[in-house]
Design a protein with these regions (language model features):
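P-loop NTP-binding/switch modules centered on Walker-like glycine-rich loops
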Residues: 56, 178, 182-263
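Conserved ABC transporter NBD signature motif
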Residues: 63-74
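Short catalytic/signature loops enriched in Gly
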Residues: 20, 139-145, 233-328
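ABC ATPase NBD coupling module
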Residues: 58-59, 75-91, 109, 117, ...
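A short, proline-enriched helix->beta-strand linker immediately N-terminal to the Walker B motif
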Residues: 167-171
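Conserved ABC ATPase signature
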Residues: 147-152, 156
Length: 328
């Protein structure tokens, strides 16, 4: 199946403390129609910046090279009506819904705003908003439209935000850690909603998270990012059982387990780095337990291996060792 979204060697530079710095480096990804792709990594790895690049929500002054293609068209070249149509095709669900709503506006106002801009009547916009709320499991939609954000729990407000994105009937949903601020039970409910919507509507989903297990539970494939670069992309089940990159294996070991005690919790040595802080060769080399001299001398390309892609010069020789270590 051809890709709906394709990123090819995407590099983004932003002003950081007055200087242009690289925040994404040669990012290459694809998402097919109806596919869920997980994007996993520590804070600062470039996950959110990748989503914002796709949505064309980068700050002023950003320098972008490489390609972002949507349905075969170069996103950076879209203007006017074509750009508006593209933005209607892309829904964005943010981590903290309260940071993206006006606290003094009723739920119905911000839900129907986009529809009203397209000359949809108030009555029809409200009807469609109520239907969208029902699709995400929110009952008594008419009453909810008259409420304010502070009257809703975090989980309920996140459902409202998902419903609002559905009103433009997007083909691509960018979910940027949409469950991080929620309790475990509500997190599972929201994930089930996203997965059901994706399957029922054929949505392409980019699901951003720091949780490797969460991505594996709902995503067909998972891409792992470190220091602004993709270091591994693979079918989710294979990535969990047989990781190709030492960083993926380290994430697998560090994930919390139900039977873990304080003495048995594992962390990744060192600290995560942004793209402009990382060394020019392998960005993970300062923290990697398998580092050799050549790892610090050359920047590995993203290359094909065993049905996936990996950015590591030692990937073939380490495979067996990484598979064992990922299971603790």
């Amino acid at each position: 199946m051809s890709a709906l979204v394709e990123l090819e060697n995407l590099t983004v530079r932003l002003l950081v403390e007055g200087e242009l710095q690289t925040v994404l480096s040669d990012v290459s990804l694809t998402i097919a129609p109806g596919e869920a792709l997980g994007l996993v990594g520590e804070s600062g790895s470039g996950k959110s910046m990748t989503a914002r690049s796709i949505a064309r929500l980068l700050p002023a002054g950003a320098e972008v090279s490489g390609a972002i293609r949507y349905d075969g068209r170069e996103v950076g070249e879209l203007r006017g009506r074509d750009l508006r149509a593209y933005r209607g095709d892309v829904g964005f669900v943010f981590q903290d819904p309260r940071a993206h709503v006006n606290p003094v506006r009723q739920i119905g106002d911000f839900m129907t705003e986009a529809l009203r801009l397209h000359d949809v009547s108030r009555a029809d916009a409200s009807r469609r908003a109520i239907a969208a709320l029902a699709d995400v499991g929110v009952k008594d939609g008419e009453r909810r439209l008259g409420q304010y954000p502070h009257e809703l729990s975090g989980g309920l407000l996140q459902r409202v935000m998902i419903a609002a994105t559905l009103l433009t009937e997007p083909r691509l949903l960018l979910a940027d850690e949409p469950t991080t601020a929620l309790d475990v039970t509500t997190q599972a409910e929201v994930m089930a909603i996203l997965d059901e919507l994706r399957r029922d509507r054929g949505l392409a989903l980019l699901f951003i998270t720091h949780d490797l297990d969460l991505a594996g539970a709902v995503c067909d494939r998972t891409a792992v990012m470190y220091a602004g670069a993709v270091v591994e992309t693979r079918d989710s089940d294979k990535l969990h059982s047989d990781p190709l990159h030492p960083y993926t294996a380290a994430l697998a070991v560090a994930r919390p387990r139900v039977d873990a005690t304080a003495e048995r919790l594992t962390t990744i040595a060192g600290r995560s780095q942004s793209a402009y802080e990382a060394p020019p060769a392998c960005p993970f080399s300062p923290r990697c337990p398998h580092v050799q001299d050549r790892c610090t001398e050359e920047r590995p390309p993203l290359r094909e291996l065993d049905g996936g892609q990996v950015r590591c010069v030692r990937a073939e020789e380490l495979r067996g060792d990484l598979a064992v270590s990922s299971h603790g």
